[in-house]
């Protein structure tokens, strides 16, 4: 019975965390983005998207606030930098949400250019390796002429 209660609690904590938005891309939750690495009895383990990410403290605070509001005051939020976060940890749902929001998800290995999230054209070009946040690059579609962000692979 104790094991079943822990499974239920773990699932409820995951559901709580799925409601915590990423502060830089609020259409994604911290679960969608793959920042939450583990939920164990009494502990949530997170990894920021990169060492020194300015949003890390905000994410920790928002997670803590959500856990407290859901009644999980005894759950610790811990940060691990190793292994480092990778775009491979973005969930399929997260990738779909990025695309629907107008941000091209990270490219697959060997892919040379992202499809335009506005019109779907593969005729795109990089404008700047640096986008609106350190995690994004600025691209433009040659078919519809719309600029868009690409979530960088790392």
Predicted regions and their residues:
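Domain-level signature for proteins that mediate thiol-based redox and metal-cofactor handling
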Residues: 1-154
């Amino acid at each position: 019975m104790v094991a079943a209660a822990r499974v239920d609690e773990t699932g409820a904590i995951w559901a709580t965390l799925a409601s915590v938005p990423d502060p830089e891309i609020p259409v994604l939750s911290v679960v969608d983005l793959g920042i939450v690495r583990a939920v164990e009895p009494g502990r949530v383990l997170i990894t920021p998207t990169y060492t020194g990410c300015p949003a890390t403290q905000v994410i920790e605070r928002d997670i803590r606030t959500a856990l407290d509001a859901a009644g999980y005051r005894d759950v610790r939020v811990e940060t691990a930098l190793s292994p480092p976060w990778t775009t491979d940890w973005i969930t399929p749902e997260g990738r779909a949400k990025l695309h629907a929001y107008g941000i091209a998800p990270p490219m697959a290995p060997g892919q040379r250019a992202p499809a335009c999230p506005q019109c779907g054209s593969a005729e795109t070009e990089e404008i700047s390796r640096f986008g609106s946040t350190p995690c994004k690059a600025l691209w433009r579609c040659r078919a519809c002429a719309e600029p868009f962000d690409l979530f960088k692979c790392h």
